[in-house]
UniProtKB/Swiss-Prot annotation:
Catalytic activity: a quinone + NADH + 5 H(+)(in) = a quinol + NAD(+) + 4 H(+)(out)
Subcellular location: Cell inner membrane
Protein origin, superkingdom: Bacteria
Name of the gene encoding the protein in the UniProt record: nuoC
Keywords: Cell inner membrane, Cell membrane, Membrane, NAD, Quinone, Translocase, Transport, Ubiquinone
Purpose of the protein: NDH-1 shuttles electrons from NADH, via FMN and iron-sulfur (Fe-S) centers, to quinones in the respiratory chain. The immediate electron acceptor for the enzyme in this species is believed to be ubiquinone. Couples the redox reaction to proton translocation (for every two electrons transferred, four hydrogen ions are translocated across the cytoplasmic membrane), and thus conserves the redox energy in a proton gradient.
UniProt-listed PANTHER family: NADH DEHYDROGENASE [UBIQUINONE] IRON-SULFUR PROTEIN 3, MITOCHONDRIAL (PTHR10884:SF14), NADH DEHYDROGENASE UBIQUINONE IRON-SULFUR PROTEIN 3 (PTHR10884)
Cysteines joined through disulfide linkages: none
Membrane topology value: Peripheral membrane protein
EC class: translocase
EC nos: 7.1.1.-
Protein name: NADH-quinone oxidoreductase subunit C
Subunit structure: NDH-1 is composed of 14 different subunits. Subunits NuoB, C, D, E, F, and G constitute the peripheral sector of the complex.
Length: 207
């Protein structure tokens, strides 16, 4: 009986990583968990191993798990199940073998999240890492030009963090007296957003 492509990839990952392999499967997709200290070496192996050959990194992003497991519905309140607050995720493609893989690592320090840059492994992640730094504040050690890429250079904070205020912290406007754009604290009154109430399936029945 012939193995499927997914089974072949599983076996090849097992052979490459041995006891260090932490692999999960969901919806026909594989996710490889890698410790932060092995992030660069593991990704290098994924790219260079002839049995894997993930020569293309099609996406890199940050994730903030601050409120993970705290849903609005009772059945969604599973509590924290993560290894940390911030994660970095890459989606890889092997053109040679025609398969894909998701790889995730966790920043060990929630106060100063930092992982190794993958720029030497996949040069195309340059702006991806800058975006994750800009939006989440994740530092990529070894990146030669880790600057903001979407927000203004004077922007305060990282807007995709779960605890970033919806109204922001700074606003800018044109000052007719100074005849230039100026920055000032936000003048929007903060407000609490109440989640919508989801009615039960049986609501209104029996009336």
């Amino acid at each position: 009986m012939m193995m499927t492509r997914l089974e072949t990839l599983k076996n090849n990952l097992q052979a490459a990583f041995g006891q260090d392999l932490a692999l999960t499967e969901s919806l026909g997709e594989l996710t490889l968990e890698v410790a932060a200290e092995q992030w660069f070496s593991a990704c290098t192996k994924l790219r260079t191993d002839p049995a894997l050959r993930f020569e293309s990194c099609i996406d890199l992003c940050g994730v903030d798990y601050l409120t993970w497991g705290n849903g609005t519905q009772p059945e969604e309140k599973t509590g924290p199940v993560t290894r940390g607050r911030y994660a970095v995720v890459v989606h890889l493609l092997s053109i040679e073998h025609n398969w894909r893989l998701r790889v995730r690592t966790w920043a060990p320090d929630d106060e100063f999240p930092m992982v190794s840059s993958l720029l030497e492994c996949w040069p195309g992640v340059n702006w991806f890492e800058r975006e994750a730094f800009d939006l989440y504040g994740i530092v990529f050690e070894g990146h030669p030009d880790l600057r903001r890429i979407l927000t203004d250079y004077g922007f305060i904070g990282h807007p995709f963090r779960k605890d970033f205020p919806l109204s922001g912290t700074v606003e800018m406007r044109y000052d007719p007296e100074q005849k230039r754009v100026i920055y000032q604290p936000v003048t929007i009154d903060p407000r609490e957003i109440t989640p919508r109430v989801v009615r039960e399936d049986s609501y209104g029945m029996g009336r």
